[in-house]
């Protein structure tokens, strides 16, 4: 009898045949080895089929699901696959993003006490610089914003328990026009007051937003992915990367304190002016 893995990792894909192998490799090199990887094709071409076949030929952890193009990004296909599985944990990565080697390790630790986790916000801009997205869905203020129109949700590094998924009224479903697919799914989880949510406390994934790279050629995108994949796979490079992130966090904290100071000073002046007006 085959043992049930701890994780189901899902990579939805459509037309990133040259980038997909890097995303897959970032899953295969995880420090937690108990996982299955489901690559869900949403109207893919032969180049994507060939790319997955090359990687899955000698690796039984990879399953390729080849489906016709859906109205959006193949959300119902994800639902079908999850209903077939009994793994305790689920996580995702976009086909043009990368996971740190310890993503499953830290996600498992967080999901031991939470139903849903959101990845530590980190992406690379078009100039090659790291950008932090400071969000904590464990805080009620952020949760309320996410339930409205603001979207900080990201598929990459999203994780949830299978029991929490089965409690949802719908699960993955076709997203209405004008809405982000990831945000639409997060809202379903967050609409349940009993859903225990948090954000990972350290970076475990690196995103490369397509919206910042719409004019890039396939060669340019692959060169970028190859560069960062090498950095993430090297222990020393990864340590340097974490130092860069700590520097960014320190800078953000200083800016926040400056902003708070200015806000307090502005409020103090306003109160002083009101007191003077009332004493007239």
Would you name each region that the model predicts?
Residues 1-249:
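Nucleotide-sugar donor-binding/catalytic module of glycosyltransferases
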Residues 230, 234-280:
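Boundary detector for helix-to-coil junctions that initiate low-complexity/charged tails
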